[in-house]
């Protein structure tokens, strides 16, 4: 199996450690080619399959596997200890979200490259070797990703443009879905592009990506203010500002189910209509826009707020009963956006975590 290091002081990490998780990640030495960092929250069976996919790759690389358990209650940590004893298991006493949990894993990473792998994502044969080969061949590449496909082999968004008010408006309006082959309207998800051609892009999803450890040391870890969503967008932007490039490589294929951990935490009044996800996304969107675009955070929020308010009004006045019922969904989105604005004070601060 893989070779691993012991987690040491991070095995039963508590909350006080995480205030320093944004500090520079400086590898002591590169004992491995790749450190695979996997964050899991109540995804025991998927996590088992994910770890088995790492083994099935049969890679000749020196691989370190690090699993961060985000205070699961389904026996995930015990399963890792029993079935995958060579993995570095880090138990968090609280749900750290995506960014902070990965930051904790980065502290134990000793690979030349760090691979982010969701617990509901599965490597295919040769994916690790090709990832490392691409990074070795392009020293300016700070981070790269591959083709994300669903269990039914359907293509998932695997490389995107940075969020802007214009890009958000195109997606909200439905024009991106209506004209996916348009280079203008399909710009955010790059739906116009040939999925079989490699390309330099703005950012790649955190479900699977490979990061140069030296580059991570220069720009720092994930910004801990992002509990979930936008953390990888922020990291890619910081890497680009340091002169590194971000790449999409289609010869790397990863099967991704998607959204499993984010569905495991009950909160708010209910999780109906994706209210919880909307709240988390809007909080992170405001933090991101405020950090990188200043006062544009207000315009981004206002645009989406007005859009959903208009949708709620239109659906409420519809003669179609089913369409009128969906007005609740739009109203709930409006409510969550208002709460996100209050919680973050317009993107100026991150609410107490876990969200």
PLM-predicted stretches and their roles:
Residues 53, 69-77, 94:
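A conserved acidic beta->alpha catalytic loop
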Residues 92-109:
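Glycine-rich, basic loop-to-helix element that forms the pyrophosphate-binding segment
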Residues 241-324:
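Active-site-adjacent helix/loop segment of glycosyltransferases
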